[in-house]
């Protein structure tokens, strides 16, 4: 039998597909399970478009199964009106009896209120499954709402003798290896902004 952790891991994998397209929203994946089998899945694909839970519900072919299914999601479902209606309303409307959540959303409009809305409508809620992994995935989003500042990465390269580049170098010079360059390009793709400067 597959565990809650197994399904939340699948949600995380789905959520990662939204990287570069959902900011300033978080990356969210959702899976719907009936009789220990996945019957629906979705992720937040683009900022302003349907959230993961809605896409997962929409992907279920036999909607009658939703009344006996469990919805898994890596981040607490939203409960406020923004560019889209609240995900909690969609879950409640479809009579999904159980929701398993990776971590709470620290955005002030949600922050435990999504869980409360579900429980107030007789939905069984379990949260904190693979919590640290889920927080790590959305560290930029959560940091912004927890600390009221952007998530910052500091990167620099220098030689062993503390120089930035050889003297009188008239052509491009790489101090870092290919693996480091690959990592930097990955970071640049994940961040919303980059500040470049010199001493």
Go through each PLM region and give its residues.
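Short active-site-proximal "capping" loops at secondary-structure junctions
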Residues: 38, 44-50, 106
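A structural motif shared across PLP-dependent enzymes of the aminotransferase-like
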Residues: 20-23, 27, 46-51
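Zinc-dependent deaminase
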Residues: 1-22, 38, 63, 67, ...
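Short, conserved beta-strand segments within well-ordered enzyme catalytic domains
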Residues: 31-33, 39-43, 70-72, 100
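Local cysteine-cluster metal-coordination motifs and their immediate loop/turn environment
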Residues: 43, 50-51, 71-90
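A short, polar/charged loop-to-alpha-helix boundary motif
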Residues: 45-58, 175-182
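Short beta-strand scaffold segments in enzyme catalytic cores
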Residues: 27-36, 156-157
């Amino acid at each position: 039998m597959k565990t809650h952790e197994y399904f939340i891991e699948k949600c995380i994998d789905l959520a990662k597909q939204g990287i570069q397209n959902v900011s300033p929203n978080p990356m969210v994946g959702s899976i719907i399970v009936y009789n220990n089998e996945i019957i629906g899945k979705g992720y937040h694909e683009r900022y302003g478009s349907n959230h993961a839970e809605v896409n997962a519900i929409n992907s279920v072919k036999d909607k009658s199964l939703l009344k006996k299914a469990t919805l898994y999601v890596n981040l607490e479902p939203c409960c406020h009106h923004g560019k889209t209606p609240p995900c909690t309303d969609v879950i409640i409307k479809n009579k999904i009896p159980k929701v398993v959540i990776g971590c709470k959303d620290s955005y002030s409009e949600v922050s435990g209120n999504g869980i409360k809305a579900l429980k107030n409508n007789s939905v069984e809620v379990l949260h904190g499954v693979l919590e640290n992994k889920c927080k790590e995935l959305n560290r930029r989003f959560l940091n912004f709402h927890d600390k009221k500042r952007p998530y910052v990465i500091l990167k620099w390269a220098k030689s062993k003798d503390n120089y930035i580049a050889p003297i009188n170098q008239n052509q491009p010079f790489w101090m870092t290896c290919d693996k480091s360059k690959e990592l930097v390009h990955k970071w640049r793709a994940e961040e919303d902004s980059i500040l470049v400067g010199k001493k």
